[in-house]
Amino acid sequence: LILNGFSSTGSVVKEGEPFAAIFGGAWQRDSSGNIVTDSSGFPEVAIEQQVIGDPNPDFRAGLGMNLDYKAINFSFLFETSQGNDMWGGTQGVLRHFGIAPETAVESVAPVDLPIYGSSDVVPAGSTFRGNIGDWGGGLVALDQSWYSSNGGGFGQVGEQFVNDASWIKLREITLNYNFPSNLLDFLGAKSGQIGVAGRNLLLITDFKGVDPEVNL
C-alpha cells in the first residue's frame, strides 16, 4: 500500500517492513553489497524499487525542569528523536537545479574523467564545475549532467538522499516574574506575572538541508 511520495521515493505499508517505510529507487549492488558500476564508472540503478529507510525512531525522550526562586520562575524542555531516517527531498531538488553548495564547487581533473550520459570526458588538468566521484569503477566527473539526472532529486534513485535524521531540540524555555503582593493590591488583582518564552531555539542534528521534523 503506497501512502504518498514521488516516482523515485515514497512511503509504503508493506508486510514485514516498518510502518510507513521509505520505499524507492536504489543503486544496484552485488552479493557483497558493493555498488555495481557501468563501463564509465557511474553507478547502475537497481531494476526494482526497495525499502531504503525507516522513518520510525528507535526512541523519543524529553527532559525538562521547572525552577522557582522568590518571584522568578524559570523552565526549559529538551526533546530528542533518535534512530529515524528521512528522505532529503530539498537537497535533491537543489542538486537538480545546480544550486546546492556541493554543485557550486570547482574541481581539477587528475585524469580524463568520464561525463555522465556522454562519450566526452573532462580532460586531465582542466578545471570544471562539480565534484569527482568514485563508486569503485574509477574516477568520474560529477558535473551538472549528473546532478540533473540520477545524481539529483528528480532522478531514479532516492537512496542517496536518505540519511539519519536523529535530532535534539531545545523545545521551550520560559522566564517569568510574578508580581509582588503590594503591586497586586494596587492593581486590585489576585495574581499576575510577566515573562518571555521561546520555542525551538536550538537544534542539534547531522541531517542536512532542513529541520528533520518537517517534511522534505
Residue ranges and their predicted role:
Residues 1-30:
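Polar, glycine-rich mid-to-C-terminal structural blocks
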Residues 1-11, 91-100, 207-216:
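Flexible, surface-exposed loop regions and adjacent strand-edge segments
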Residues 26, 64-66, 174-178, 197:
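Outer-membrane beta-barrel architecture
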Residues 76, 194-196:
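Membrane-embedded beta-strand positions of outer-membrane beta-barrel proteins
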